[in-house]
Amino acid sequence: TFTPNSHYWLGQLYFAKKQDKEAVKSFAAVVSYKDSNKRADALVKLGDIAARNNNATQAKKYYQQVVTEYPNSASAKVAKTHL
């Protein structure tokens, strides 16, 4: 469906504007769609937001989740660079 993609791009907009609370809401909505093709990317972005807000432990959890759930994806390669 288009819904997760809409949430993803809205999250990207908020992320770029450093409106992290809104970005987290949008990316979390994407993650709730287990079959979304943007789910792994949204998890990376949630990790990026956590890292930007000095929450290294939470960031690592998001990045590790990407590597575990999507091991052969481009998102996993990105996540690994942050671990």
Predicted regions and their residues:
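Short solvent-exposed coil/turn linkers within tandem alpha-helical repeat scaffolds
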Residues: T1-T3, S32-K38, V67-K77
